[in-house]
Amino acid sequence: MSDDTSASGGTSAPFPSPVTADPEPGATASKLPGPIRSNIPTPATSGTGIPQPSKMKAPSSFGSTGSVSKIGRPCCNHTTPKSGPPPREATSMSRESDDNLSSINSAYTDNSSAVLTANTEQFIIGQRVWLGGTRPGQIAFIGDTHFAAGEWAGVVLDEPNGKNDGCVSGKRYFQCEPKRGIFSRLTRLTTYPLAGAQTPTSPLAKSSPDRSRTVSPTASIRSSMLRSPGIGGKNGMAVGDRVIVSSGFGSRPGILRYLGETQFAPGNWCGVELDEPSGKNDGTVDDIRYFECKPKYGVFVPIAKVSLSPSSKKTRLSRTGSRESLTSIGTMNSIATTATSRMRMNAQQRKSSTPVKPILATPKSQFSMQDLLREKQQHVEKLMVERDLDREDAQNQALQLQKNINELKARIVELESALDNERKKTEELQCSIDEAQFCGDELNAQSQVYKEKIHDLESKITKLVSATPSLQSILPPDLPSDDGALQEEIAKLQEKMTIQQKEVESRIAEQLEEEQRLRENVKYLNEQIATLQSELVSKDEALEKFSLSECGIENLRRELELLKEENEKQAQEAQAEFTRKLAEKSVEVLRLSSELQNLKATSDSLESERVNKTDECEILQTEVRMRDEQIRELNQQLDEVTTQLNVQKADSSALDDMLRLQKEGTEEKSTLLEKTEKELVQSKEQAAKTLNDKEQLEKQISDLKQLAEQEKLVREMTENAINQIQLEKESIEQQLALKQNELEDFQKKQSESEVHLQEIKAQNTQKDFELVESGESLKKLQQQLEQKTLGHEKLQAALEELKKEKETIIKEKEQELQQLQSKSAESESALKVVQVQLEQLQQQAAASGEEGSKTVAKLHDEISQLKSQAEETQSELKSTQSNLEAKSKQLEAANGSLEEEAKKSGHLLEQITKLKSEVGETQAALSSCHTDVESKTKQLEAANAALEKVNKEYAESRAEASDLQDKVKEITDTLHAELQAERSSSSALHTKLSKFSDEIATGHKELTSKADAWSQEMLQKEKELQELRQQLQDSQDSQTKLKAEGERKEKSFEESIKNLQEEVTKAKTENLELSTGTQTTIKDLQERLEITNAELQHKEKMASEDAQKIADLKTLVEAIQVANANISATNAELSTVLEVLQAEKSETNHIFELFEMEADMNSERLIEKVTGIKEELKETHLQLDERQKKFEELEEKLKQAQQSEQKLQQESQTSKEKLTEIQQSLQELQDSVKQKEELVQNLEEKVRESSSIIEAQNTKLNESNVQLENKTSCLKETQDQLLESQKKEKQLQEEAAKLSGELQQVQEANGDIKDSLVKVEELVKVLEEKLQAATSQLDAQQATNKELQELLVKSQENEGNLQGESLAVTEKLQQLEQANGELKEALCQKENGLKELQGKLDESNTVLESQKKSHNEIQDKLEQAQQKERTLQEETSKLAEQLSQLKQANEELQKSLQQKQLLLEKGNEFDTQLAEYQKVIDEMDDAASVKSALLEQLQNRVAELETALRQANDAQKTAYLETKELRRQLESLELEKSREVLSLKAQMNGASSRSGKGDEVESLDIETSLAKINFLNSIIADMQQKNDALKAKVQTLETLPMDFTKPHAFDALTKRKPAPRLFCDICDEFDQHDTEDCPIQGSEDQDYSTPSSESNNNEKERKLPAPRKYCDSCEVFGHDTSECADDETY
């Protein structure tokens, strides 16, 4: 193929027209070898003189890109054209390109396409190579080209035997001299010359099967096989769909413009606008317009002959471009083109062949669906063979046409060279004409000059002539000589004039003749110029059109390149995702295809096995019947055995009853075990269901376990503390018991002392002298009693103080209880918040899926647990309150008893002092316990901190539920703070953890039911919120009260400070005398006062801050509620906005995906298919090799089938052996019966063993019962311990009742303390004021001290003066020291008073510290709330950012949509521009479908061979079975025959002994017996004939042709059906013309009339055309072997 052919676009006309005018006489169009008319209709010429394509469709391989790899290897040698042929009109432009020849010849150039070098990466530009191993040159270009796909090498040859100068189709790839450039594949280049390499003389030479050269005319065939599967009438097609019209001229594509009834013929018709002007009308028939189109583009066809084009069908993305889609298209095209081959092959047999009898339909019972499928497959195989022949004929015709095209191109080149010569001649003629014209002008100018001279001379002559007579008259005598001279001169002049005139006339005549000749020449040249100009104009127009088309093509290419670049830019962005999707889909497609292939293979194998098994079943049924009888016998035996077993079962049932009696004791335990087992089974089922959930939950459970372990540690610590407290309580109780015992002993002693007193009284009466002593002793006793009463009063005061302390403790506990209640309320509020958030989470969980539901379920479970824990804490608090009340009551009762006993005796005072010390110890122990509790609370807080860390880490992993988990953490913190007094064991936690996994499954179900309950609970929670607000107000009121109490305390402090200040003023007067010692004490007091003032100020600040924080908390709670409402609203709005945006995004993504899919499809079709089909060709070659291998394997299988016949015979022997084996099996069955009897015995033994095992199990159960009893005993012990603990609890409750009494007293004392606190607060305020005054006084004192220091200096100066006065001073100093000692004693007393004040201050400090703790907790809560606010603000900021991002994304999406719309518009323009290219791509698809069809043919042939093998095997089996049956029948008949012969002989022998009367009867018996014998002989003869026929069938099957690939391979099996006849659907006539050739359709040719039936009857015979030329070397029709060129072209 020449490189001037443009293969890229496929726009160059493959059928150029010859030039109409030929100036050379020899170069006429008649000499051009045209195609011999066989079945090709005459093409209709267009306006430009270009022949239109024939109605017969070119083979689908013309436009294929599959042959691109063999581009440039045609079979013919044609001259290289310098310029391309003129293009066709846009309306009639064909889609075939100039690479058709290479695509057709690719099937015949296997020698030229041999791979010489596999490593193509070694070649470099400038490297010296040998083309084909023979022609040397240098590489000048390596890369992709526009004329063909793939990588090509441009080589500059050493010799001018190339094809071009580096330019192909107007595109320059490199530059070299003409005829030295050539393009070749890299695989055809070598780096060294090949020794035996020669150019093949006939590159297309290859072996091909012989076939007939007679060709029959084509015709339209009306057959059901032409109907494609896609046709469904109006349901399958719609107006505007792209369709294919199948007819005798091939399949023609077009667009469906009309579908419905017409007036020119009944029925539904399809009006199609064809792509090429090969139709009949312009949409109008009989002056009725059905649709509009160009003339010769419209045609009306029945619906049966129209099928949807594959391009119009909406195929799935995963199937487009796949092999299945290509094969389906190929089968559609192949079915559409089978009718012509059948007509062509069977037209010659129409006369000679007798009509085949129609095949009678057999019943459905005789033939299965497999037989029908086999018949259909055979029919399809015939159609495929005919199609192959038709395709080969079409390819040969195309080769001939291509050869004609090449010759026309050579003719065009010659005509172009002639044009150049003519142009040169015209230029020379124009030069000569210009010269002639110039010479003529000069001659005309000279002739005019001469004429003027002649005219002047004539005028002079006339003047002379007129003057001569006067001269003669005047001077005749004087001038005779002059006259003669003048006359001579005149004569001479006249002669000269005549000569000149003659010369001028001759010249004028010559000039006139020359002018006429030149005019004639000019006319002739003008005519030639006009003709040449017309020719040049036509050629220039054609060249302009061609150049414009080339320019347009180049522009289109440029635009294509630009669009490709844009598409590549867009595609590269989407290609990654698309390739990924394609990869996934391709994997799925491959998987599905593999599954389909496996299913097909399995179905085929199952069908073959089913056929074999049906045959085997027929054989085995007889054996089964025999075995059924044996089984019946065995069943009878088994029945007997079963009866025996039933007897044994009765025995075993008796044993079972015994076992049941034994098991009744264990049934309850077994029921419990069964319940537990059922629960375990259910849990296992739930675990099986939640395995996937557990994988995720295991991590969470592990975290929870860690938390649980930490909680265990904390709880163990708390339990240890509680145990210690309990131990301390028990020790206290023991001490109280001891004290009670001591009191009882004391009472006993009192009673004894009273007895002694009575005795003493008796003695006093006897002894009067002892009265005085007794009076004195009584006085002493009275004094002691007074002292004891004083001590008793002191004790009562101490008791009151203790009561006050108890009241303070009770108040503290009440405060703690209130705090716990507030915390519980807060926890409930937090629970409400969590529930609200849970509802939000549920809404989110509907979107988030299982994880959200799991988290919600977890949180719900945790909340339920926390609720239960909170309820437990409340119950425990209530129990503690009741215990405290009971203990207070007990204390009150004890106090009453103590008071009564204190009145009776004074000895109790000492014990009371001891009790005071013990109470102090208990208080110390309690304080230590409080310290321990505080340390443990700190440990709990540390554990909570660790829990917070863990929860934070968990929150990082769970970003979606971070807020909830933080809140849950807060709740857990508060609840862990509340759980300081709880009693919880590790077993409960483990049970909770075990329940947790169960509740996770049930939580999902409960969520739906609880969602309704939550809505009701929300209303309750709102009420509870109102109650909480009231509680907050109450707490505020309590805070105001506390403030008032603080003020009172301050006042009391101020009063005490006033007193102190007064004392200080007194001390100052005394301290003026003292210099140094008093100042230190004052400084200490001042520092203490400053510390107390600072602490008071700090406490006031804390109180104010607490108030502010409470107010801020209120505002924060309200703000958080509002923010939560706003956030929920914004979340709802955002969710709706997000849903809308997601919907829009999904729509835009869908649009983008569609656009990207279209762009990808276009780009991939333009880019990938060109390369992909090349690879497919390689794969086809590989597959062909594989198929050849398979054919060889199938031949071997056929040989194996022949061997299988021998194996069948051997199997017959083996079947006999099987019979013996069956007999042996019968014996084995009998043996097995014996074995079963033995088994029955073994079963009996096993039953016995099982009974022993059951007994062993019973023993085990007894042991387990013992263990259970031990456990029950342990449980009883635990119950006893619990009872004891309950008793202890009761005791504690009683003590609590006593304590409650004490609490009441303490509460009363607490009221007094509150009053005192109010007073103290007032004192504190007064003290603050006094402190300010004291500070001013201290400043003054400091000033006085300075003055005193100055005085001391002065006194030191005056020491020398005062030495004399030192003695007096020493005396004064001694006096002062005495006074100082007194002052020290007073100071000690004051210090004691100060210590008491410090104790009170310490108590107030403890109260303040508790308040500080509560304030700290409030601060922590505030900080947490602030953190929540921050998180909410961050979330709101994040949401705002997300909104802004979404807005930006929306704007970007809108911009991208606008860009995409612009791109879509450009794409539409691009689609309009690519319409013709898509046609070429469609032809490429058709070619690929052809290749796939070839593969299908090979697969079908393989399947045919396999079916043939199966048929042969089936036939062999059936023949073998029939022979078996026949042999059996023959044996039975022979037995009957022998029996009848014996009976006849016996009758003959008996006839001889009978009398003559019975001769007639005997003759009748003989006749009947002879008739029977004849009948039996006839039956035997029929059976033998059938046997012979079956043997003949077997022999024919054995002698089948081994090569089923030949076209006549199946002629031995079935006869060819007669070819279908021509039929016109409009005229409703046979054998006249096709529907598409009906003259009624033609809108222009209305002169046609419907042919009559007589003409049909008379003109049934059709003449055959003359045989076509055929090339043996090329194996192609269209040229003879002698005309074939031998050189190889590229």
Curated annotation (Swiss-Prot):
Residues 1-11, 39-51, 214-226, 865-885 have a biased composition (Polar residues). Signal peptide: none annotated. The keyword Disulfide bond does not apply. Disruption phenotype: RNAi-mediated knockdown has no effect on nuclear positioning in fat body cells. Residues 1040-1052, 1410-1419 have a biased composition (Basic and acidic residues). Residues 1-105, 195-227, 843-905, 1031-1052, 1400-1419, 1635-1665 are annotated as: Disordered. One of its GO terms (biological process) is cellularization. Keywords: Actin-binding, Coiled coil, Cytoplasm, Cytoskeleton, Golgi apparatus, Microtubule, Phosphoprotein, Repeat. Gene3D superfamilies: 1.10.287.1490, CAP Gly-rich-like domain. Pfam families: CAP_GLY, CLIP1_ZNF. Specifically expressed at the tip of the furrow in cellularizing blastoderms. CLIP-190 and jar are coexpressed at several times in development and in a number of tissues, including embryonic axonal neuron processes and posterior pole. GO terms for cellular component: axon; axonal growth cone; fusome; Golgi apparatus; kinetochore; microtubule associated complex; microtubule organizing center; microtubule plus-end. It comes from the Eukaryota. One of its GO terms (molecular function) is actin binding. The modification Phosphothreonine is found at T327, T362, T1681. The modification Phosphoserine is found at S64, S67, S216, S309, S322, S325, S328, S1682. Residues 143-185, 260-302 form the CAP-Gly domain. Residues 378-468, 484-660, 667-916, 926-981, 1001-1121, 1158-1549, 1565-1600 form a coiled coil. Its main location: cytoplasm. It is found in: Cytoplasm; Cytoplasm, Cytoskeleton; Golgi apparatus; Cytoplasm, Cytoskeleton, Microtubule organizing center. Interacts with Lva. Together CLIP-190 and jar may coordinate the interaction between the actin and microtubule cytoskeleton. May link endocytic vesicles to microtubules. May play a role in formation of furrows during cellularization. PANTHER family: DYNACTIN 1-RELATED MICROTUBULE-BINDING, RESTIN HOMOLOG. This is Restin homolog. It comes from Drosophila melanogaster. The lineage of its organism: Eukaryota, Metazoa, Ecdysozoa, Arthropoda, Hexapoda.
